[in-house]
Amino acid sequence: NGGWTTREQLNDMEFEAYEELVRWMATLPLYAVVETEERPYLLVHAGIQTEAARAFLLEHGVDCADGAGAVGADRELLQQMLAVQSSDDLLWIRHGYWDAPTGLLSAEGKGPVVVSGHTPTVSLGRYCEVGGLAGLDEESGRGQIVRLGGEDTAGVPDRIDIDCAAATGSEFGRVGILRLDDGAEFYANINPGE
């Protein structure tokens, strides 16, 4: 995953600014559960270990099997489920997350949807079947938000990748913003030199 650019930039910082940045980063959450009128969303950097998530929920009385999903899980239980996820998975997972449904949505499309990034949508084809260049907007040729799953959940995707390759720079990259209340997408291109 590199990190060399970040490392170089951190090395170039004044020590006090570096310390302040590290202190601030330590206060940031690894995950969040937010609710809209329609459903809860699990916000994580990279994804979740779905088998561990379903096992935790089952231990706490929510059986996701047979198309039931995690409909019975309230916000507090979803927070607890995320709290026991490995921080490595929350920050780095790809295989085992993008390539299979989460099992958290019911057959009717009810339950929590996972929103994550870390994997640029232009690279999703390495980790799952997304069909062609789903991660590239045909008109602009830049990264775009991709919704995955839905085949067994009444057309409702169970995973949303919002990493539109901003870190790759101006050729493909842009910032993607997803408004959860209505699913509206907004984009800001990365310009040369940014």
Where are these regions (language model features)?
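Active site of divalent-metal-dependent phosphoester/diester hydrolases
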Residues: S87-S116
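Active-site neighborhood of divalent metal-dependent phosphoester bond hydrolases
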Residues: N1-A52, F56-V84
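Active-site neighborhood of phospho(di)ester-bond hydrolases with catalytic His/Asp-centered motifs
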Residues: V44, V114-H118, I160-A165
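A short acidic-Thr-Gly-centered motif at the start of a beta-strand
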Residues: A32-E37, G103-A107, Q144-A154
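Cytochrome P450 core scaffold surrounding the K-helix E-X-X-R motif
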Residues: A53-L58, L124-V130
